[in-house]
Amino acid sequence: MTWLQETYERNKRWVYFAFAAVFIWGMAAHGYAMLDNSFTHDSLSEFDANIFGDGHKIMLGRILVPTYRQLFRGDLTMPWFIGLLSLLWIGIAVFLVMKTFRIESKLIAGLVAGVFVAYISFSSMTATYINDLDNNMFGVMCAVCAVFLWRRFSWGWLPGIAFVIGALGIYQSIILVTVTLVMIACILDILANL
């Protein structure tokens, strides 16, 4: 059995819980927008990213968005698929937060999932910029993964740098997710050593 399979078997229950909690919160909070073609704002001009989207994203400094689109979803804006990808990335992020901070309570884990899914950036993007929702949530997952690697492995900050660069290449303000989680980790370390 490989290292990845062993890790999965050890954490299978929490992986399923994280994804179930994210999916339930996500459908309750944003199901209508994800299952409806109500395009607004940039979603109209980026319905087909080949027309305006890729060049515009690169000019804004979001240099990895075209690569992300080609790898994961293509150029068309399909709200249901974008919604599923977004929930997938947030599910991974929630699981990594649970492992980073060693959360063992289902109640706390469910609340963490609710915070990730219902926070204002997710809500506003779902309502107005659904064309960017999945790639931005991929950036959030990269930001969380960087903190997870930094906290769990002695040299984890090295690959963590690549994940921070990935988050910055998707959307620059996602760096705040990394900064916030690092601050929480530092505060918890200080409190543990009092």
Predicted segment positions?
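Short hydrophobic/aromatic helix or loop-helix immediately within or flanking a transmembrane segment
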Residues: 55-80, 84-89
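Extracytoplasmic catalytic/substrate-binding loops of multi-pass membrane glycan-assembly enzymes
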Residues: 28-48, 56-68
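Membrane-interface transmembrane helices that cradle and orient dolichyl/undecaprenyl
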Residues: 143-157, 189-193
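Transmembrane signal-anchor helices characteristic of membrane glycosylation enzymes that use polyprenol
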Residues: 10-40
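Membrane-interface micro-motifs in multi-pass membrane enzymes
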Residues: 58, 62, 86, 107-151, ...
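Perimembrane helix-loop-helix junctions
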Residues: 178-194
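Short, Lys/Arg-rich, polar N-terminal cytosolic tail immediately upstream
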Residues: 1-11
